[in-house]
Amino acid sequence: MLSQKEHIITQQILRETKAKNKDNLTRTNAYKRFYDRHPEMKWSLLASFVSRNAGWSMTDLKGELFHPGLTDQQGHLFFTAYERANWLIFSDAYPQLLLYEWSKRCSQPLFHLLPYFSVSRFMSAEWEHFWLKHDTERLLYALIINEQYTIQSPIIQNPLLKKNVFHSIQYLFSEWGHFQTVVFPTVDGHLYGLTIRKFSNVKERITLGKKLAKLLFRADLFSDFYHFMHTVPHTGSRFDFEPFLGIARRSTPFLRTVYPVMTHSLDDQREDWFQKKLSPSLFEAEPLPKQIELTDWYFHKKRQLRFLFSLEHYFLHK
């Protein structure tokens, strides 16, 4: 049984999460604002940047490059995969962040309430550990691990999405050509980022997340990344950063002009992904590759992707 105070807290968290889980823009902004209130929550800033990238991927589907190579059904399924993952991660993670905020406000840990938000047992233990040890790096990694396992079964292994999105020729083109990339722009015209080849592999995504965290918080680059995020409003279009690269014409739309708010449902009795002990290596740091600046790469890959989709269109429609 919850006390009256606990009931008030849980209901407030549910209301706030629902209000800010409206679409990619509200989620991205909520993550950023939470980090500004609690800078020890590194994952929240990383999540905001990754969520920005998800929004850019969504509007790519309606842009000049991708749109001609997709049927309406394919475009809808690709958007559903991006949006559903973005929504599900926020549904799981944001209540955890808010409960931490309430714990600070009350000067006592409230993590025994995590099960009321269907949060994994894995994270209950990690939050308790963080409250005692203040190990920000471990919590960062724990949240990365948790969110990737959270989406593995309902999104990545969903039969419909697996067949029509993650095994589609368009998606395989993207993986083969290194287009599954998360980018961190700067206002002085540089683009940094990392690529994943096997997005459907949960451990590959966890490795990418840890590398992205290392890149984002690198001492010589962090202020540039944060300045971009703090000063450039998120519209969902890559034109948020392309003018800084010298690109004068917008080729992808603003997110809210092409996608209505999508209604989701969440199984309150969803199965906890944490069923067996994890490998300690998941908590180990990952080295960055030599190539982290992708400014020139970005232009080259756009040309390459245009060529690949023209080939796909030719062979499938001749």
Regions found by a protein language model. Give the residues of each.
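Functional cation/ligand-contacting sites centered on basic and imidazole/sulfhydryl donors
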Residues: 1-318
